């Protein structure tokens, strides 16, 4: 239970980090509720809405599985994402090699986990080596610019490869009609949450330039980072979530068991005391 409630609290800024989740309504009817968001949400929110200090975008729904090649070694890999430099500004994932400020700043860069570094490069220094990624839509060559620790098991984010966001085709960078990214914002105060949710639909109107989803009201739910794991499962989640109700039920069950054990102990103690009193009497 303690483990389930510890998710994503390893990041020092977690009380101010929120995931931006997409909502779509027709009139008052909620028709869609997704964990993912548009590629363009983060930058537009930072530019137009007060209270957002920073943001990051993670694109992992576009090409989550790719062929990765290094020299003669060719493997099919998953847990591949595209991330912008804000990733290491918001999250405290440890970088063992490389510079957090620059490792995702240019096209054609990739940060890999320590396990992946051993898998492809054995004892060689991976920094500066080239990995070739071939997905359903794009093929790119990336220079390894960082090696990070494995992401903790009590994180809802788990990737083996982080490719620089600008490695994606330019038209996708701010594209509003592909909700295939995960957006996280850093707020100057948690009190901004309701204000941003209220103002987002008004802001969204000027970005809805295509017919797709134009008949719907675009909105967002801002979910605190530490709450993501135990909130209800939505469409396009990164991973299967935990169950808050089940965790609470376990806590109450544990309390009940302890209470019963305590009552039994008291009853047994009283019974023994009375028995000794009769023996003395």
Regions from the PLM with identified roles:
Residues 3-65, 170-172, 178-184, 188, ...:
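Membrane-proximal extracellular/periplasmic loop immediately following the first transmembrane helix
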Residues 28-33, 72-75, 240-241:
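Acyl-group handling in specialized metabolite and lipid biosynthesis
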Residues 39, 49, 58-61, 69-99, ...:
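The feature marks short, hydrophobic/small-residue-biased sequence motifs that occur predominantly
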Residues 81-97, 108-245:
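Mid-to-C-terminal secondary-structure elements
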Residues 240-253, 277:
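Membrane-interface helix-boundary signature
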Residues 247-267:
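Alpha-helical transmembrane segments of integral membrane proteins
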Residues 262-281:
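Intracellular coupling helices
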């Amino acid at each position: 239970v303690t483990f389930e409630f510890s998710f994503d609290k390893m990041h020092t800024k977690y009380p101010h980090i929120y995931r931006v989740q997409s909502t779509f309504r027709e009139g008052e009817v909620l028709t869609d509720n997704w964990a993912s968001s548009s590629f363009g949400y983060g930058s537009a929110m930072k530019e137009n809405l007060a209270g957002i200090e920073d943001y990051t975008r993670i694109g992992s729904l576009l090409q989550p599985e790719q062929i990765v090649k290094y020299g003669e070694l060719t493997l099919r890999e998953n847990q591949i994402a595209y991330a912008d430099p804000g990733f290491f500004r918001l999250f405290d994932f440890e970088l063992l090699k490389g510079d957090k400020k620059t490792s995702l700043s240019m096209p054609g860069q990739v940060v890999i986990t320590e396990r992946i570094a051993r898998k492809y490069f054995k004892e060689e220094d991976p920094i500066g080596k080239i990995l070739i990624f071939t997905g359903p839509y794009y093929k790119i060559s990336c220079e390894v610019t960082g090696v990070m620790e494995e992401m903790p098991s009590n994180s809802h984010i788990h990737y083996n490869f982080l490719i620089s966001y600008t490695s994606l085709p330019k038209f996708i960078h701010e594209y509003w009609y592909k909700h295939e990214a995960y957006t996280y914002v850093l707020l100057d105060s948690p009190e901004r949450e309701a204000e941003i949710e209220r103002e987002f639909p008004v802001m969204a109107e000027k970005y809805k330039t295509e017919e797709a989803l134009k008949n719907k009201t675009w909105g967002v739910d801002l979910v605190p980072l530490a709450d993501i794991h135990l909130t209800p499962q939505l469409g396009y989640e990164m991973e299967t979530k935990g169950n808050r109700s089940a965790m609470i039920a376990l806590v109450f069950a544990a309390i009940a068991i302890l209470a019963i054990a305590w009552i039994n102990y008291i009853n047994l103690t009283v019974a023994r005391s009375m028995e000794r009193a009769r023996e003395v009497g």
